[in-house]
């Protein structure tokens, strides 16, 4: 005699693990795109210091020399760089009324939208930001193999490069993959002092040479990513539009339609690119 066994569906959903975005720690939103799809930033030149021409009794014989005692009188240059938003992305899906009822309400528009943002939208935005930052970094030494013996010295070299470029010493962040962080924890020089819960809640796992250490999943970073030391002033990461809607009463379906649109981008500022040091691995 055959027996048909019962299959029970649990009233929970097996969602994917997805890390929270850390981009806000590494970038800024100092510029306003309201009413425009692009903005232009001025880059103003400077002039060198001269030896003041004191006690001069005759006009200079060299006609190329300025009559001014302060030095040659030249105009400052004012060039621009354009920041044009390139990513205008969208999604749409339907939650059928019968499907919602017959899945014990697990297929529900509100939670489905939150899942879409967490598992699809945020990872894409993050990946774009990290790609832009590594591509536009002002310091990019040759790719090298990182080990527990050299990782600490390599990071100190990055810190020195930013110091020599006169990048502010505060608010720096060190971006590492889980693999790089594992090497760092094995380095004898690493300070294993535990940090507070408040900093961990923000995504900071340690502090090294004054920089907050931020661990980012490898899937959101370029291939061969070793580590990146950054100051947030170097990268602008605007999100001009975030438009997400749940439409219950529509003639297009017997159910709930969820739509979303996000317009975003990231830019490394030309005069501040020295605030990013990117080390690739072999």
Where is each model-derived feature located?
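Extended, solvent-exposed, turn-rich assembly/linker loops in the middle of proteins
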Residues: 135-205
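Residues immediately flanking
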Residues: 44, 97, 178
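Alpha-helical scaffold segments that mediate packing/assembly in large oligomeric complexes
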Residues: 97-165, 277-282
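Long, hydrophobic/aromatic-enriched structural stretches that serve as scaffold segments
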Residues: 71-109
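Intrinsically disordered or highly flexible coil/loop and linker segments, enriched in small
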Residues: 15, 50, 126-130, 168-171, ...
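P-loop NTPase signaling cores
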Residues: 59, 65-66
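Sequence/fold signature of self-assembling virion shell proteins
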Residues: 2-59, 79-87, 187-282
């Amino acid at each position: 005699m055959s027996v048909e066994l019962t299959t029970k569906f649990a009233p929970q959903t097996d969602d994917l693990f997805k890390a929270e975005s850390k981009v806000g720690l590494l970038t800024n939103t100092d510029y306003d795109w309201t009413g425009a799809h692009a903005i232009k930033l001025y880059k103003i030149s400077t002039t060198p210091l001269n030896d003041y021409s004191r006690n001069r009794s005759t006009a200079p014989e060299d006609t190329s020399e300025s009559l001014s005692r302060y030095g040659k009188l030249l105009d400052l240059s004012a060039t621009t760089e354009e920041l044009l938003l390139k990513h205008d992305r969208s999604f749409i899906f339907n939650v059928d009324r019968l499907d919602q009822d017959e899945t014990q309400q697990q297929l529900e528009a509100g939670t489905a939208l939150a899942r879409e943002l967490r598992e699809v939208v945020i990872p894409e935005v993050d990946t774009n930001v990290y790609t832009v930052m590594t591509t536009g970094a002002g310091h990019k030494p040759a790719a090298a193999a990182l080990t527990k013996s050299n990782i600490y010295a390599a990071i100190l070299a990055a810190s020195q490069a930013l110091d020599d470029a006169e990048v502010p010493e505060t608010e720096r962040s060190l971006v590492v993959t889980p693999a790089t962080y594992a090497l760092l924890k094995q380095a004898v020089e690493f300070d294993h002092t535990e940090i507070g819960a408040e900093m961990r809640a923000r995504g900071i796992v340690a502090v090294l040479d004054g920089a907050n250490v931020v661990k980012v999943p490898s899937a959101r970073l370029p291939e061969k990513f070793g580590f990146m030391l950054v100051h947030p002033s170097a990268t602008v990461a605007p999100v001009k539009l975030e438009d997400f809607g749940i439409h219950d009463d529509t003639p297009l379906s017997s159910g709930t339609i969820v739509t979303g649109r996000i317009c975003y981008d990231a830019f490394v500022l030309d005069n501040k690119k020295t605030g990013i040091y990117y080390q690739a691995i072999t």
